[in-house]
């Protein structure tokens, strides 16, 4: 049978549908059950819809102020974002006064029981006005519904329209309370549609060229965006807008002027690429820059689209000369090592082939927290025989996978990292990274370096137990 019930799930037999063992002879439609509510009793690693909107999509915007309409807990949760560094450079050549503004500040309404009983809309209005005065450099305000305000029915959109006129700035209401969907993926969708309907097409870029692209679903985790931008600059391609890494609020307004959209994170941001194509006839291309061969292939595809493949070839040749010798050394050190890829969504199908084909590793397990069926179809095609594919894994399953499949290293998020360490297994952060960037040629080299350093660290020789003992 292709589906597996872990021993720890004996009391939750429904989990069997979420765990799939890859077999070549299985029908294509055999996939883990996904994008459904977490089964009661599971200690899920998922985030909520609000986290998907603020923590992924809008949290990377450099000049926006965020007002969380919630009790203080959700505001604190909204502050715990990924490492999305931002520069001070603005599209018109000016400098935004605060570097990494998006990482430093967040505001909230701090709802109390009284606000829940009598409504919190007046408090939200006061908070937006006060926050705008406290941070006059912010060019826009984004406000968010949460579970509490979604349940009591506060109309954050009406408040946002009213306050926008009063303060003279865009106030964008993101209506993605935590319960809006089974995973943070619903928050991605809501934020995509909200930003498209409220912003796209409302302003023009300062300069346009024949080689303008939107880089969509690239959030500049630990500088990923800046790596890709350098490639494109060397090819003569202008990144007109990013969605939303190191972007300013106004960049989203002129996305409709690009000649092509490149969609990097296809789970969180294909929505807006489709909308741009439908309404403004901006075609989009799904791209993958993790690993050497994928990066080569997608740079060439972009160059060929604009009729400049020779420029892509030059970029590829230059980078391969720089990283080739060290990659070969690290391949020799990592070959045969077992790896478990445990990320939110697309990295689970971006990484298995590069890890196996380019570093000689063996991917023994892949698990995601919010992937959809189309993503699992890609995962299934890209992993080897007997690979374990798990949807919405819980903490006890994590322990059982470590015990039974003995990965030498896990690529995961912060929530899983320290549990893995306690079980004696090295772990490299694949969400926010250790020593990124991890994208592109030099990024893949950084990832290989971090895996090598983690696996061969002498600290593991000091442990008094092994996983499973």
Swiss-Prot record:
Catalytic activity: N2 + 8 reduced [2Fe-2S]-[ferredoxin] + 16 ATP + 16 H2O = H2 + 8 oxidized [2Fe-2S]-[ferredoxin] + 2 NH4(+) + 16 ADP + 16 phosphate + 6 H(+)
Keywords assigned by UniProt, alphabetized: ATP-binding, Iron, Iron-sulfur, Metal-binding, Molybdenum, Nitrogen fixation, Nucleotide-binding, Oxidoreductase
InterPro entries: Nase/OxRdtase_comp1, Nase_asu, Nase_comp1_asu, Nase_comp1_CS
Cofactor(s) listed: [8Fe-7S] cluster; [7Fe-Mo-9S-C-homocitryl] cluster
Record GO terms (molecular function): ATP binding; iron-sulfur cluster binding; metal ion binding; nitrogenase activity
PANTHER family noted in UniProt: NITROGENASE MOLYBDENUM-IRON PROTEIN ALPHA CHAIN
Protein role: This molybdenum-iron protein is part of the nitrogenase complex that catalyzes the key enzymatic reactions in nitrogen fixation.
Protein name as it appears in the record: Nitrogenase molybdenum-iron protein alpha chain
Source species: Methanothermobacter thermautotrophicus (strain ATCC 29096 / DSM 1053 / JCM 10044 / NBRC 100330 / Delta H)
């Amino acid at each position: 049978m292709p589906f597996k019930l872990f021993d720890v799930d004996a009391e939750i037999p429904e989990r069997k549908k979420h765990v799939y063992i890859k077999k070549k002879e299985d029908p294509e439609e055999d996939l883990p059950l996904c994008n459904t509510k977490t089964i009661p009793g599971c200690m899920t690693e998922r985030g909520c819809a609000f986290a998907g909107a603020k923590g992924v999509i809008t949290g990377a915007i450099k000049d926006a102020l965020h007002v969380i309409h919630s009790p203080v807990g959700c505001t604190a949760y909204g502050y715990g974002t990924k490492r999305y560094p931002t520069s001070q450079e603005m599209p018109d050549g000016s400098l935004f006064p605060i570097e990494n503004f998006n990482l430093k500040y967040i505001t909230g309404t701090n709802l109390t029981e009284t606000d829940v009983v009598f409504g919190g809309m007046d408090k939200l209005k006061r908070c937006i006005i006060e926050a705008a005065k406290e941070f006059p450099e912010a060019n826009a305000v984004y406000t968010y519904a949460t579970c509490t305000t979604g349940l009591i029915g506060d109309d954050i959109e009406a408040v946002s329209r009213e306050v926008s006129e009063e303060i003279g700035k865009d106030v964008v209401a993101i209506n993605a309370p935590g319960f809006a969907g089974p995973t943070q993926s619903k928050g991605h969708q809501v934020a995509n549609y909200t930003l498209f309907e409220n912003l796209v097409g409302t302003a023009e870029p300062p300069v346009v060229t024949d080689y303008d692209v939107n880089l969509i679903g690239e959030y500049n985790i630990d500088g990923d965006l800046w790596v890709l931008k350098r490639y494109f600059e060397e090819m003569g391609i202008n990144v007109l807008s990013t969605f939303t890494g190191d972007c300013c609020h106004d960049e989203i307004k002129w996305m409709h002027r690009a000649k092509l959209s490149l969609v990097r994170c296809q789970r969180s941001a294909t929505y807006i690429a489709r909308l741009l194509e439908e309404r403004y006839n901006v075609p989009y291309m799904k791209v993958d820059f993790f690993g050497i061969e994928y990066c080569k292939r997608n740079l060439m595809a972009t160059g060929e689209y604009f009729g400049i493949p020779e420029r892509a070839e030059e970029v590829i040749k230059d980078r391969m000369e720089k990283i080739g010798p060290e990659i070969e050394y690290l391949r020799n050190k990592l070959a045969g090592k077992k790896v478990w890829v445990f990320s939110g969504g697309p990295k689970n199908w971006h990484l298995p082939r590069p890890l196996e084909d380019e570093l000689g590793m063996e991917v023994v397990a892949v698990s995601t927290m919010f992937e959809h069926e189309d993503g699992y179809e890609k995962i299934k095609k890209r992993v080897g025989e007997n690979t374990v594919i798990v949807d919405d894994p819980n903490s006890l399953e994590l322990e059982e996978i470590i015990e039974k499949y003995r990965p030498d290293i896990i690529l995961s998020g912060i929530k899983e990292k320290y549990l893995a360490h306690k079980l004696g297994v090295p772990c490299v952060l694949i969400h926010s990274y250790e020593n990124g960037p991890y994208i592109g040629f030099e990024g893949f080299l950084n990832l290989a370096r971090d895996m090598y350093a983690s696996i061969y660290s002498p600290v593991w020789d000091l442990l008094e137990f092994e996983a499973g003992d």
